[in-house]
């Protein structure tokens, strides 16, 4: 509404847990919204205003994800009934590539990428680590799964195959 009132069209690309929640219905909650919003100067101003009005933390929209955006993105548009905002999310393939490369372990207060990886592996019916690498190659042609993460991803694939979790 705020963007529309100013005659602005914001392009919002939502990543991470919020994308999994909105587009793939895989989670019930996320603590923040990882997003790249253009134009960013207007978006930051409007996000501060929304945070103030809704009593949200100032960093409720986190644009740190922009450091990890692939040279070739795979995005899809979500239906959205607002003239001031266009929302896109990564495809499942692109999210899998991002999550597999990050492969962050759980920490106190942070659940990491394991549950999201498990969900994506199941959704996409991935059967091998090389299948995961093929998705990575589409978006990050110069990156490979770290050796220490390969065993974890193989274990998650096996869990999904056996129908666990």
Question: Where do the PLM segments sit?
Answer:
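Compositionally biased terminal segments of proteins
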Residues: 1-165
